[in-house]
Amino acid sequence: MIVRLLSLVSLLALLVTPAHAQDREVPYWATVRAKELNMRVGPSADYKVDWVYRRPGLPVKVIRVMEGWRLIQDPDGDKGWVVARLLSPDRGAIVVGKGQTELRLDPEADAPVKWRVEPGVVGTLGDCDDGWCEFTVGNRGGWILEKRLWGAGEP
């Protein structure tokens, strides 16, 4: 009887979780899922398109939730409304700052340099610790200073 009850509770938890995933506490990080994403001036398809993103994986900060819409802030600080289903909970980041920065073999300033990346490069964000983050661009990855990434750390 207890096993059946636990199984039922587990099943109910699985069914309820996707609905709650859309109601996360803001702010939180997300990435652009679609090949093309319209940012609107309000939370409806009736509002004017203010900007079109054409960069899957671009990190955004979700700052407000309204039904199927999310108010986002992009790396340039621009804000607008997008359809929630076109965002992914996957973590990504974009290289910021001036000039190239290094992707290193290990999370240490004196670790060998594997690659150099330019500001504006978008990649997948891994774990961050002690000011360093795992960062992958295509099939190339390494460790990069957290301060050179927008999309890392607390939103």
Per-range role (PLM):
Residues 44-47:
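Second-shell loop/turn segments in exported
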Residues 5-15:
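Bacterial N-terminal signal peptides
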Residues 21-41, 52-56, 63-78, 82-107, ...:
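SH3-family beta-barrel domains
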Residues 1-2:
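N-terminal secretory signal peptides that target proteins for export/translocation
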